[in-house]
């Protein structure tokens, strides 16, 4: 049986048909609807995330792959430049640089052929996640604020290097940025336990030539240091030209400059992208813990009515990759009243961060898409984002089905039939995303489908069907398969 027929019969769901209603649907008979289901229009069919590995692409091969996908029943592609897998054979192909003339020429090849054979194109912003580039100025790069805390003996002289603090706090990111630069924001001694902010002693003036030297009072104390790292992380799996520092998503001017640079470069050769694309796409908002921007303290004061800086050493936890908390019990023990105050400040901090991301990144992206006449698609959730509100303005809000329907992590760790975690249909992401679509009357709820199957090149269609059904249960109406290359 032809692969296309299998895909059409197994993977095209009633949910997808309902999500993309025909203009004349009210006049269609049940017989006509059945015919549409037998041979769906391309917009009802699943799309694929189409990886351009290392941007090592050639015109003839791109055309061949489009036809291969078309014949398999795929309706569209998400063009997704990504880093080349380490250690794999390059097959003597030349890497193209993102936004170079040669790279844009390859876009034209795809746009022309996709249009000719009736396929749809989406285009990712940048490459990898979260997006950025080697060309970003230092002011345009993401920043992170981290807290250092360690007990110090009372009644003795503390003599230590700032370098040791910087080394301990060195951000645990997915891809280290060699340009990362630490800056000391504050330095405190705090009693352990601490019951009031006024008990902390500012010792910032006790640093000379990178050495902290201070007489610690009698008793139990903790040394706190707040450190800001500029250029702290690189794009995860970025292709050449878009693989440098992560963009500061809390800087509206930097975001708009990045977006305009991308479209200005492409449209200078190809004309309006609205003639070629259905949607722009923003991948995972895994900002590696980014939590700061140059005017954050000023914005916090304006919005919350008090100065956040004295509180920050006590509100932050010890963190690791992606900003995941490594240690909640960090630094001095806190009295009940002080702990309650710190929790309230922490909430205000996270609220301010989410507001800035919503206003400066998300709304900037939406406005830019509308100006370009291209639909917006994004995975607008993750640490620091409003899980519901961020999806409300998108034309195509997107969720994800992240794993196989029955594995925890690898073969030999199968989940039993009674395990509610089978298929990840229980997770909140898709439910928030689909709820946002329902609230806005939007019927297309996109999904990065089956992100990790753990069985590369051996996954059965049955396996994909069961896994994608779980996504459909959580409100998904359109699959973008992860992936094809």
Model regions: which residues?
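Hydrophobic targeting/anchoring helices
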Residues: 132-133, 372-485
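The substrate-binding groove and active-site-proximal loops of carbohydrate-active enzymes
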Residues: 45-58, 89-105, 238-261, 283, ...
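Positively charged n-region of N-terminal signal peptides that target proteins for export
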Residues: 1-6
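Bacterial N-terminal signal peptides
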Residues: 8-18
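Boundary at the C-terminal end of the N-terminal hydrophobic targeting segment
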Residues: 18-26
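Beta-sheet entry/capping signal
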Residues: 75-78, 118-122, 220-223, 274-283, ...
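Mature extracytoplasmic enzyme cores
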Residues: 28-40, 45-47, 54-64, 68-76, ...
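Alpha-helical scaffolding segments of alpha/beta enzyme cores, especially the outer helices
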Residues: 64, 68, 102-112, 116, ...
